[in-house]
A protein has these predicted regions:
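SAM/dcSAM-binding transferase cores
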Residues: 440-498
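Alpha-helical transmembrane segments of multi-pass membrane proteins
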Residues: 1-228, 232-323, 328-427, 432-441, ...
Length: 498
């Protein structure tokens, strides 16, 4: 019996950590700033566990019955936590209240589990052995969960089904305990019925997981969701309405097929057309292949390397018929080489030189992306360019995120490079900004590809003129150890979204 109860410790430790990871991941997906979200979720969860452990002192008789009930409650609340949070984000204005309330409730219940189980084991081991065995299995369970979560659960099950699976494990522990401790459970039939009810609810939730996600996302997106994928790095959603296809990463719009050509023509051609000798081009980010499509409009280009972290992103835009139609089959071109790796690490490892680089990362909404907008990153990138080479960076909105935009400019300049900022109007985004960086002064091109839909030599100079409400403001450069850009970005966009 004792080994079976210790196995329960392993399982419930795994469950508790998975619920915590799911809450932190969902908060990062939906609210951004992963450091803040994980810090506050973990802090709330640990404090709640402390409350649960303190409350366990008031549990006197009926330890086995109360342990089973706690397991069922953890399984029910934790199992449905992800589904509740998805729906709450879409339909309530108090998502943070729901988030921390759920984290607190689950934390209190998990905090009750181990003290109750230790008291159940004290008649079978010496106290020192109880503590040693329970904590050993508790930590091993946490290790297993921390490995399973990013490698198996998120990419293969998604957040909703992962939570439900571990809810079923909690319920399974409750059923197992009623069999192991049947002599200490006077109301065993009632507990069996409660366990069965919880299992049935969780199974129904599992079967309805896709529908739950549809309900949650139907209010997040104005158009119909035609594809949704969870990867170890992000949630990819495609929506469609008539001939307008839109890509969202972690609920943030990346492009609309109706006007993305404005963004991508402005991103690529002002810089690349000014480099008539460029033959080798590097693309960092841009896993949709749309920047590559624009690069290949220059017949002189001999080689393009695209580095994107998420293999599912590049696979999707290499195989999906509507998406390959949009990027003109860019990834099938023999001149294009795709590398799925962290761009920062890849720059440190490779020694290849490129004549021009396009940096097309998502906005710096969290620190993992913010590191790709730092002096350290731009310095590493510059080492892969010849003396007359250049790069261009998408740099958020100079109108809606003015400090963020000029922070990118300041950061490029702090790397001892010359920065040439410009902007363009994209209906799906509004005013959007870019920065060309290099060691030599930038001069606007005298020719452009002939098949552009938006950009012309006549309109190009206007992109480099900023009206008073978008002109430069005093900001700090974005360094790796401070990442002030993430704070600027969060403050500015939070102010707009209120």
């Amino acid at each position: 019996m004792a080994p079976a109860l210790l196995t329960s410790v392993l399982l419930i430790a795994s469950c508790g950590l998975v619920y915590e990871l799911i809450a932190g991941t969902l908060a990062s997906y939906l609210l951004g700033d992963s450091v803040t979200q994980f810090s506050t979720v973990i802090g709330t969860y640990l404090a709640a566990m402390g409350v649960g452990s303190w409350l366990s002192r008031y549990v006197g008789r009926g330890l086995a019955t109360r342990f089973v009930l706690v397991e069922l409650l953890v399984g029910l609340v934790g199992g449905f936590s992800s589904a509740i949070l998805f729906v709450a984000f879409a339909y309530t204005a108090s998502f943070r209240v729901v988030l921390y309330a759920l984290v607190f409730v689950v934390g209190v219940l998990v905090g009750l589990e181990i003290p109750l189980l230790m008291r159940l084991l004290r008649d079978r081991f010496d106290f020192k052995d109880v503590v040693a065995h329970v904590l050993t299995f508790d930590y091993l369970g946490a290790l297993g969960a921390s490995l399973l979560f990013p490698l198996v659960l998120v990419p293969h099950l998604g957040l909703v089904r992962s939570a439900l699976l571990f809810g079923l494990i909690n319920a399974g522990v409750a059923v197992w305990t009623t069999r192991l401790l049947r002599g200490a459970l006077p109301r065993r039939r009632w507990l069996h019925a409660a366990s069965l009810a919880v299992v049935v609810l969780l199974v129904i939730g599992w079967l309805a997981a896709d529908r739950i996600l549809e309900i949650g996302e139907s209010n997040l997106y104005a158009d119909d969701v035609v594809l949704a994928r969870n990867t170890p790095y992000q949630r990819i959603v495609l929506t469609a309405w008539k001939d307008d296809l839109r890509l969202f990463l972690n609920s943030h719009l990346q492009f609309s097929s109706k006007d993305e050509y404005r963004y991508h023509e402005a991103l690529v051609h002002p810089g690349l057309s000014a480099q008539p000798e460029a033959r080798r081009v590097l693309v960092l980010g841009g896993g949709d292949g749309l920047a590559v499509r624009e690069i290949l409009k220059h017949p002189r280009i001999e080689h393009v390397t695209l580095v994107d972290l998420d293999p599912e992103m590049t696979r999707l835009f290499s195989t999906h018929p509507e998406l390959t139609k949009l990027n003109h089959g860019a990834f099938a071109d023999p001149r294009v080489h795709v590398v799925n790796a962290d761009a920062f690490a890849w720059l440190e490892e490779t020694h290849d030189l490129y004549d021009f680089a396009v940096v097309d990362f998502p906005d710096p909404s969290n620190y993992s992306i913010g590191k790709l907008y730092t002096t350290a990153f731009y310095g590493a990138l510059a080492r892969h360019l010849p003396p007359d080479g250049r790069f261009v960076v998408q740099s958020t909105s100079p109108l809606f995120a003015r400090k963020s935009f000029w922070c990118v400019v300041q950061t490029v300049e702090a790397t001892r490079l010359l920065a040439s900022p410009y902007h363009v109007y994209v209906p799906a985004f509004g005013e959007w900004g870019f920065v060309i960086g290099g060691r030599t002064p930038y001069r606007q091109p005298t020719t452009l590809p002939s098949d552009l839909r938006f950009l012309t030599l006549d309109t190009l100079p206007e992109l480099f003129t900023f009206p008073p409400d978008m002109q430069r403001v005093p900001v700090e450069a974005n360094h790796l150890n401070t990442q002030v850009l993430v704070r600027y970005y969060e403050q500015e966009w939070d102010g707009i979204n209120r």
